[in-house]
Design a protein with these regions (language model features):
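Active-site SXXK
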Residues: 1-13, 37, 90-94, 142-145
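Short glycine-/small-residue-rich flexible loop motifs, especially phosphate/cofactor-binding loops
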Residues: 3, 64, 108
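Generic structural signal for hydrophobic core residues of well-folded globular domains
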Residues: 5, 41, 93-97, 149-152
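Active-site helix/loop module of the DD-peptidase/beta-lactamase fold
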Residues: 7-44, 69, 98-133, 137
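Conserved catalytic core of nucleotide-sugar-dependent glycosyltransferases
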Residues: 56
């Protein structure tokens, strides 16, 4: 989805991702780029491999509360750490960048054009996509996603 936003000119991959909880003046997390989130080298603290994101998945928390409050542990771009939070934050930033059409964006710009009509990405109770998991799809839609990936997004 971020790749589609790049193609549409909505996102520059090397620019900071607009995560709403990082808006305080001087917050060093505000310099974390889209690229660092997508490569899982944001430098944000996690509490273990993959980190625990159950609060957003089943605990009633929001993406912003679960992922947006993690402090920096390393300099961004220096350490890879598999992190669901980084993907959740990229999705949150994308929603903020897209604005009012954020809930329709995955369907209009990726899923339906690829023929993935039986895919459902879940949101938290505020309507922010989770996307680190909680995406339900048929095997055929998964195959369509694989073909899209194999063909360089075309």
């Amino acid at each position: 989805l971020v790749g589609r936003a790049v193609a549409l000119g909505l996102v520059r991959i090397d620019s900071p991702a607009p995560v709403p909880t990082w808006g305080a003046p001087g917050d060093p997390r505000a310099r974390i780029t889209w690229d660092q989130l997508l490569h899982m080298n944001s430098g944000l603290w996690t509490n273990g491999p993959g980190n625990r994101t159950d609060e957003a998945y089943i605990g009633g928390s929001t993406v912003s509360q679960t992922a947006g409050t993690m402090p920096l542990e390393w300099q961004p771009g220096t350490n890879f750490n598999y992190s669901n939070n980084d993907i959740m934050l990229a999705a949150l930033a994308l929603s903020r960048r897209v604005g009012r059409g954020a809930l329709a964006f995955p369907f209009a710009e990726l899923l339906w054009p690829a023929g993935m009509t039986r895919t459902t990405p879940e949101t938290d109770w505020r309507g922010d996509f989770i996307l680190s998991s909680q995406v339900w799809m048929t095997a055929r839609d998964m195959a369509r996603l694989a073909l899209l990936y194999q063909n360089g997004g075309k």
